[in-house]
Amino acid sequence: MKFNLIIEQLDELIQSHSLTTNPDCNPDITQLAPLDEALSGHLSFIEGDKFASMIAKTNASALILPLNETLQTQATQQGIAWIATANPRLLFAHTIRLFYQPFRPSPGIHPTAVIDPDAQLGENVSIGANVVIQAGVKLGNEVCIHPNVVIYPGVTLGDRTILHGNCTIHERTVIGADCVIHSGAVIGSEGFGFVPTAEGWFKTEQSGITVLEDGVEVGCNSTIDRPAVGETRVKRNTKIDNLTHIAHGCQIGENCAFAAQVGLAGGVKVGNRVILAGQVGVANQAKIGDGAIASAQTGIPNDVAAGEIVSGSPCVPNKLYLKVSAIYKRLPEMYQALKQIQKQLEKNS
């Protein structure tokens, strides 16, 4: 595909991003590639000035650049076609869609699927091999269900939602439109509810509901539990990575992003636009305010204020954590120095 044709197809996005181009270069682009692996015919991107030195080393035929005249001049001198925008990563993400579309089977129902007569199917649905759809299930239009998915009674799926292979959607679950549930995920499973008695643990039945609003994405082998009463809710456009657990009764805001192996205990409330990096753990009933960020492996035992950045376990403000970490590396030497001071004090006393 000619580079100028790529620009034309991105025209609507370009107009909204104050984009500039190098009109004198129009190479054939055959694929996209990382900057350090790109060859002739490849398109890559540079997100910030720190990668400027790589322009001289890359073999890419075209680059998506930030709005930086120095980088643009450098690319031109290298004979590299370029397009510059305020958000190179976003433009690159849109460009990928010109070269790649995820696999989606044609509408139809595989003959091995087991569908209860009481289930309601929308138009142009795709249902793969060995899928089980139980009574009272409602599927919206253009829903895509890959092989070996099990959907319990009464579940609702919104338009264009995709369930990848081997997912399980339990009863009392509502999933909105344009959601993606990746392979092995379990949505609406029983929350961990047991009451201690003299005889042992007494099971609390989980009669609540689980709601995923429109645009939610759940990664492979992640689990979202339903509560004993009330609801577990993940709000619009939140993205959840692989191997993440959201316990019963959690309330997750809009446009959050949780990386792999995040674990939320029961009743946690998370605001909008919260970012939790890998292996963050959040204790029971903790509240996290809008826009907060927790770095990898942070342990959150209590509430976190809106906009706060926290690190460590138990968590502290990130700036304090960095100072403590710098001191931590010097503790052996500091300990030896302290021992010498103690000896000197004892000698002088």
UniProtKB/Swiss-Prot annotation:
Source domain of life: Bacteria
Purpose of the protein: Catalyzes the N-acylation of UDP-3-O-acylglucosamine using 3-hydroxyacyl-ACP as the acyl donor. Is involved in the biosynthesis of lipid A, a phosphorylated glycolipid that anchors the lipopolysaccharide to the outer membrane of the cell.
Pfam families from the UniProt entry: Hexapep (PF00132), LpxD (PF04613)
Protein name: UDP-3-O-acylglucosamine N-acyltransferase
NCBIfam families: lipid_A_lpxD (TIGR01853), PRK00892.1 (NF002060)
Pathway(s) where this gene product acts: Bacterial outer membrane biogenesis; LPS lipid A biosynthesis
GO cellular component, as recorded: carboxysome; membrane
Stated family: Belongs to the transferase hexapeptide repeat family. LpxD subfamily.
Subunit structure: Homotrimer.
EC nos: 2.3.1.191
Assigned keywords, A-Z: Acyltransferase, Lipid A biosynthesis, Lipid biosynthesis, Lipid metabolism, Repeat, Transferase
Gene3D superfamilies: Hexapeptide repeat proteins, MurE/MurF, N-terminal domain
GO terms for MF: N-acyltransferase activity; structural constituent of carboxysome shell
BP terms from Gene Ontology: lipid A biosynthetic process
Active site: 248 (proton acceptor)
Reactions accelerated catalytically: a UDP-3-O-[(3R)-3-hydroxyacyl]-alpha-D-glucosamine + a (3R)-hydroxyacyl-[ACP] = a UDP-2-N,3-O-bis[(3R)-3-hydroxyacyl]-alpha-D-glucosamine + holo-[ACP] + H(+)
